[in-house]
Amino acid sequence: MARSDDADSRAARWEKEAHDLSTQVAFLQEELALVRRKLTESPRHVRQLEERLAAAQAQLARLTENNERLVSTLKEARAQIVTLKEEIDRLAQPPSGYGIFLERHDDGTVDVFTGGRKLRVAVSPSLDVAELCRGQEVLLNDALNIVDAFGYERAGEVVMLKEVLAGPDGAPGDRALVVSHSDEERVVHLAETLIGAAIRAGDSLMIEPRSAYAYERIPKSEVEELVLEEVPDVDYTDIGGLHAQIEQIRDAVELPFLHADLFREHQLRPPKGILLYGPPGCGKTLIAKAVANSLAKKIAERRGEEKHTSYFLNIKGPELLNKYVGETERHIRLIFQRAREKAGEGTPVIVFFDEMDSVFRTRGSGVSSDVENTIVPQLLSEIDGVEGLENVIVIGASNREDMIDPAILRPGRLDVKIKIERPDAEAAKDIFSKYILSGLPLHPDDLAEHGGEPQATVAAMIDAVVLRMYSETEENRFLEVTYANGDKDVLYFKDFNSGAMIQNIVDRGKKMAIKEFLTSARKGLRLQHLLDACVDEFRENEDLPNTTNPDDWARISGKKGERIVYIRTLVSGGKGADAGRSIETASNTGQYL
């Protein structure tokens, strides 16, 4: 019985355990199914999580970008607020005035000129008072204190400097006497830029009338035309056919300059001036330029210097004339004043008046407006004033010396008178040799005729061209002139030849050689080119004598003597072959040589 109860209890326990186990198995099966289901669904869940994570990251980036944009916008807004505040503050500030700095004081204050008043004001600590210069423009605040400094005034009135007033104890002056356009004299202050500067009487200065300060030297064309310029590099060797005249001018100019002690020992006064007269185009201006260059070289050699310097005032007559009364005389004074300044430094100065007859005509002749009644005396006084200077000489050039006032030509003024003649045949050869050189491209045919020698070819060309120009043949007949006494004379082209015409002939020939090379590829200058150039030059000049007054034309051309009343051209086959006409002169004026 006991054994049966025990078995029942064990069976019941086993049954219970079996039930529990089956329950656990069922639970585990459910868990296993759940796990299997989760394992099946986990990749999709992971993808969803990844997608959500990516979306969250993208949203975070957008939010970050928006945040940065908002921060930047906020900064810009703050900057704009600050700028607008500064702009409002600036616009609300009272206006600032400008003034002219005058003088500084030991207590740190300065004097300024503003609004027509002279004030003593303070200076901002940010500015160095020692750096302020007289005449400088300064900025004043509402309390009229200097807060900034600028440059100098750049606009104002132009006046002429008459004199720089010396300072105490011979120090450089800081004031000047100036003359306005209304001839009103005024004393002005010189700005720092002009104190001690190389300004001289006659210079144009820019002033500010209210503050009475002169700021700047203004170059004016009417004055700068007369400024000394260094001599061009022209030597006597560049001039052909004028050996005798060059020797004369050397004796007149170089000897007194180079041997001044001998002249003083012999009590010989050097000439003050030279007149070069003769027909146009014969080298008067060229000689004047060569004089200064040669003189400077000789002085440099004598002093043992390498660099030679001289100055050449090339004054063309018509440039001096001015419609305002007294201006021409002022220009003449300015010319000689500049010459004296440079001559005082020991530098030779040549004052060259070209076309002298256009300004310094005979007084009282009635030929012009009689402006020479005051111009000629001004020149005479200046020439006489050059007497004490050892380094200035006046050279005048004219092709109508008979119209120059006799007082200028008398001894003691233009002492030496040198006639620059038209070149003869030998002189023409010399001039041609300056332009036709053996280094030029010569045509092979011409070279072959002279054994291939360039020198011989050039010499033959020159001889042939000069023979063509100077032969008294029918083709070279130019004019038949009739004088007032009834005499007639035939003039040839050689009677009107000049250095300028020779140069023009050579230039024409060279141009023909170039054109022939471009068309036929045959290079080189030929004799025929020069002969054709002679013909063209003659043809071009055949109409020139047909002027209103044949006698005046003849005098300008260098033909002096009996008055000419009739001119007839003799050029055959030209456009002026029948151009003869009779023209009576209005009056018998001038001195006939």
UniProtKB/Swiss-Prot annotation:
Please give the PROSITE patterns that the UniProt record associates with this protein.
AAA
- Region feature Docks into pockets in the proteasome alpha-ring, mapped onto this chain: 592-593
UniProt GO MF annotations: ATP binding; ATP hydrolysis activity
User: What are the protein's UniProt keywords?
Assistant: ATP-binding, Chaperone, Coiled coil, Nucleotide-binding, Proteasome
Entry superkingdom: Bacteria
Question: Where does the record place Polar residues bias?
Answer: 584-593
Question: Which parts of the sequence are annotated with region: Disordered?
Answer: 574-593
Q: Could you mention a single GO BP entry for this protein?
A: proteasomal protein catabolic process
Q: Which GO terms describe its cellular component?
A: proteasome complex
Tell me the InterPro entries matching this sequence. Answer: AAA+_ATPase, AAA_ATPase_domain, ATPase_AAA_core, ATPase_AAA_CS, NA-bd_OB-fold, P-loop_NTPase, Prot_ATP_ID_OB_2nd, Prot_ATP_ID_OB_N
Q: Which residues are listed for ATP binding in this entry?
A: 281-286
Residue ranges the record marks as coiled coil: 5-94
- Give, as in the UniProt entry, the pathway in which the protein acts: Protein degradation; proteasomal Pup-dependent pathway
Hey, which family's this protein in?
Belongs to the AAA ATPase family.
What is the annotated quaternary arrangement, including any partners?
Homohexamer. Assembles into a hexameric ring structure that caps the 20S proteasome core. Strongly interacts with the prokaryotic ubiquitin-like protein Pup through a hydrophobic interface; the interacting region of ARC lies in its N-terminal coiled-coil domain. There is one Pup binding site per ARC hexamer ring. Upon ATP-binding, the C-terminus of ARC interacts with the alpha-rings of the proteasome core, possibly by binding to the intersubunit pockets.
UniProt function note:
ATPase which is responsible for recognizing, binding, unfolding and translocation of pupylated proteins into the bacterial 20S proteasome core particle. May be essential for opening the gate of the 20S proteasome via an interaction with its C-terminus, thereby allowing substrate entry and access to the site of proteolysis. Thus, the C-termini of the proteasomal ATPase may function like a 'key in a lock' to induce gate opening and therefore regulate proteolysis.
Record note on domains: Consists of three main regions, an N-terminal coiled-coil domain that binds to protein Pup and functions as a docking station, an interdomain involved in ARC hexamerization, and a C-terminal ATPase domain of the AAA type.
Q: Tell me the protein's name.
A: Proteasome-associated ATPase
Organism for this UniProt entry: Salinispora arenicola (strain CNS-205)
